[in-house]
């Protein structure tokens, strides 16, 4: 019986998906309820490479999603899921061996609605360190984080999943909605910092180690004020083939 469904959004991920799946296999092997209680779903966003073929060969369920919208991709994966627990991780990440056990333990607590594992970074530099320092206060104040994001399937549907009207920050909006839902019944988001995922630095490799300060922050205000600027920022940063 499937207990836990892991959804992996993917677009042209033949290079990095195998190393993620290697770590997922290790986490499934360590799962106290057995590897067969975990299903892995790759939501393929119209890849031009062999992502779907690779995922199928590795035993993953595969769902094809046409719109270039990360929220729609995550939602399509969730719609295919059978587990009572849903989790989401990016294809360029790697997961900790105790991830699924830690998520089970967290959601067994009566005061937890969901959360995330947080991440460790593959490499550091001054620009990356300052970016991290700029972001971490928000994480600490809100309890929201990245890495492997998880919740009960019932709560995912209660908040409507990821907002497909949003071209960016849909993950933040989802966690805000989950947080609001939890507060209605005395629950909170949690961070599982003892099982952090490992995040790749490909955004920094492509855009530069200082790009949060030279591109993202300067582009944030226009993106808030003008839909066209928001679309262009999302396209350049998230939806290019060489992202």
Feature names for model-found ranges:
Residues 13-32:
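Short, well-formed alpha-helical segments that are part of the catalytic scaffolds
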Residues 25, 32-46, 63:
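Short beta-strand/loop segment that forms part of the nucleotide-sugar
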Residues 23, 44-52, 93:
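A conserved acidic beta->alpha catalytic loop
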Residues 65-81:
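Glycine-rich, basic loop-to-helix element that forms the pyrophosphate-binding segment
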Residues 50, 89-106, 176:
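Acidic donor-binding/catalytic loop of UDP-sugar-dependent glycosyltransferases
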Residues 155-158, 166-186:
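A short, conserved alpha-helix in the catalytic core of glycosyltransferases
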């Amino acid at each position: 019986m499937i207990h836990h469904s892991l959804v992996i959004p993917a677009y042209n991920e033949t290079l990095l998906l195998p190393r993620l799946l290697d770590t997922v296999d290790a986490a499934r092997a360590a799962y106290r309820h057995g590897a067969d209680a975990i299903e892995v779903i790759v939501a393929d966003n119209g890849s031009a490479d062999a992502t779907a073929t690779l995922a199928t060969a590795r035993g993953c369920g595969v769902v094809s999603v046409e719109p270039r919208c990360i929220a729609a991709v995550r939602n399509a994966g969730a719609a295919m899921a059978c587990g009572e627990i849903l989790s989401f991780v990016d294809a360029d990440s790697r997961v900790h061996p105790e991830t699924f056990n830690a998520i089970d333990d967290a959601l067994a607590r009566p005061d937890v609605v969901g959360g995330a594992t947080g991440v460790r970074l593959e490499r550091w530099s001054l620009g990356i360190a300052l970016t991290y320092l700029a972001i971490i206060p928000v994480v600490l104040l809100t309890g929201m984080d990245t890495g492997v994001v998880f919740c009960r399937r019932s709560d995912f549907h209660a908040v409507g999943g990821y907002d497909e009207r949003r071209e960016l920050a849909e993950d933040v909006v989802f966690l805000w909605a989950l947080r609001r839902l939890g507060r209605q019944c005395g629950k909170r988001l949690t961070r599982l910092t003892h099982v952090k995922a490992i995040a790749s630095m490909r955004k920094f490799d492509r855009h530069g180690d200082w790009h949060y300060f030279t591109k993202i922050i300067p582009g944030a205000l226009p993106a808030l004020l003008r839909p066209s600027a928001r679309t262009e920022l999302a396209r350049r940063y998230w939806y290019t083939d060489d992202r």
